[in-house]
């Protein structure tokens, strides 16, 4: 699904006894050898570079009075430097070599002991050759190999493959404790979402270990090793076809009548014998500024976005009736509207008359499920009267649903998964709603597990 593309990068790590003056010299030299995007250079970078180049002259511009606080005590060196930087004129700033100033900034941002990235994209052969051949005289400049992800199938399944932090980002703040406890460095590139995060420990490989000698010389102690590959159960051709079909269908559906509240669909294709996920996709419809609809990927919602399942759960609901002797196989019940005091009528989509369990499932009778739920809850139903049920009725249903994978973790190997919403109400009306899939919520992945179990 993806490849690692090796890329050459230039970095700088300040060596012992290297002065600011020497770094200025290096910045000028390197700026003539490397092509770097200098568009991010700022006024403060230019002032800093001018200050370092003319430090004595600029510091002399700060008067004795400006060097003292109101109480007569001497200001800190940092405060004095801030004043000195304001003494640099705009003409002097405009005279600064922008390329050298930006290189100097890259050499000195962050901690002095840290390795700084100078260039990591579009490195030319002659640039790489120059740095490599002159490492001994470039006082801290070096070359090394980095990598970037190449996705062989574009955006297909990309959101579930996940992301890796950039070389500039390193370990994100919210994941720092997790990774630092595992021995990572703050500037390491790490998996930060979905499969990249889930399998980081297998994908990361092993760093080379060096022994640091005098003058920051290095000797190799042990070589690094590449990380492992992981093999997914996803059938990529099926995945591509699924995404194409779903993209087309959600857009077509949105243009149909009575779809004001519709904006997304999910599909999971799995092997019910093994539980393997063969393809999965979620697509969401959005409206652009031009008023036209467009489709975006929403596949993570398969495990993170619980939905009200509706009638699909009636198969599990009818098993509750069998288990707790509310009905037997073939039991016939009258499909007619039910009325609980102070609540609206509860009906099926049409009145079906006297029906058995098979007919009730085939034609999605709500009332058949309502009457099962009343019996499971030991209720005494009378038209338009209050209805009380036993406290354990909900737990009987939830226990059965859980055996099918609803309301419990599916075990999918992704770092985030919602359990869905489990209602707290004990009202009889809500139990009836529950029995037809209109109360608790479940993720599309849980529903896929439910269907596979059946």
Which residues are covered by each model-predicted region?
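Membrane-proximal periplasmic segments of bacterial cell-envelope enzymes
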Residues: 1-218, 222-223, 265-266, 272, ...
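Solvent-exposed, polar/charged alpha-helical surfaces in well-ordered, non-transmembrane soluble domains
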Residues: 3-4, 24-32, 129, 133, ...
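Residue-level detector of alpha-helix boundaries and kinks
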Residues: 15, 116, 145, 184, ...
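Surface-exposed beta-strand edges and their flanking turn/coil or helix-capping segments
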Residues: 16-18, 156-158, 173-175, 244-247, ...
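Solvent-exposed amphipathic alpha-helical surface segments
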Residues: 37, 249-253, 379
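Short, well-structured beta-strand/strand-turn elements
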Residues: 141-143, 252, 328-332
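Beta-lactam-recognizing serine transpeptidase/beta-lactamase-like catalytic domain environment
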Residues: 208-225, 234, 238, 259-310, ...
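Structural motif corresponding to the C-terminal cap of alpha-helices
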Residues: 245-254, 285
């Amino acid at each position: 699904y993806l490849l690692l593309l090796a890329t050459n990068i230039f970095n700088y790590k300040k060596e012992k006894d290297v002065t600011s003056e020497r770094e200025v010299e290096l910045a000028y030299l390197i700026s003539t050898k490397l092509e770097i995007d200098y568009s991010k250079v700022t006024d403060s970078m230019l002032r800093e570079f001018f200050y370092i180049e003319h430090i004595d002259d600029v510091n002399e511009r700060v008067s004795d009075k400006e060097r003292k606080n109101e109480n007569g005590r001497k200001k800190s060196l940092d405060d004095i430097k801030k004043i000195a930087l304001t003494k640099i004129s705009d003409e002097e700033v405009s005279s600064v070599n922008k390329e050298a100033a930006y290189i100097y900034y890259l050499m000195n941002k962050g901690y002095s002991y840290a390795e700084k990235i100078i260039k990591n994209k579009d490195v030319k052969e002659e640039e790489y050759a120059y740095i490599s051949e002159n490492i001994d005289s470039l006082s801290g400049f070096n070359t090394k190999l980095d990598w970037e992800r190449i996705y062989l199938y574009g955006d297909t399944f990309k959101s579930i493959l996940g992301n890796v932090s950039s070389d500039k980002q390193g370990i994100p703040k919210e994941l720092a404790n997790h990774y630092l406890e595992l021995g990572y460095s703050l500037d390491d590139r790490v998996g930060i979402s979905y499969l990249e995060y889930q399998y980081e420990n297998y994908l990361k490989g092993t760093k080379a270990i060096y022994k640091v000698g005098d003058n920051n010389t290095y000797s190799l102690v042990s070589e690094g090793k590449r990380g492992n590959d992981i093999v997914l159960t996803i059938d990529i051709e099926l995945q591509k076809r699924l995404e194409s079909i779903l993209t087309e269908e959600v857009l077509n559906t949105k243009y149909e009548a009575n779809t004001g509240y519709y904006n997304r669909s999910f599909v999971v294709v799995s092997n019910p014998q093994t539980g393997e996920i063969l393809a999965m996709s979620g697509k969401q419809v959005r409206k652009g500024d031009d008023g036209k609809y467009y489709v975006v990927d929403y596949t993570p919602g398969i495990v993170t976005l619980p939905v009200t399942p509706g009638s699909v759960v009636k198969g599990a609901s009818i098993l509750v009736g069998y288990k707790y002797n509310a009905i037997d196989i073939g039991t016939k019940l009258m499909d007619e509207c039910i009325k609980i005091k102070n609540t609206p009528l509860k009906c099926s989509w049409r009145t079906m008359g006297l029906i058995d369990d098979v007919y009730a499932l085939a034609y999605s009778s709500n009332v058949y499920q309502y009457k099962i739920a009343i019996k499971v809850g030991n209720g005494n139903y009378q038209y338009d009267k209050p209805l009380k049920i036993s406290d354990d009725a909900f737990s009987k249903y939830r226990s059965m649903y859980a055996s099918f994978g609803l309301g419990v973790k599916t075990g999918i190997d992704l770092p985030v998964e919602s359990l869905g919403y489990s209602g707290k109400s004990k009202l009889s009306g809500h139990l009836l709603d529950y029995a037809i899939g209109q109360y608790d919520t479940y993720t599309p992945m849980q529903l896929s597990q439910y269907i596979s179990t059946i």
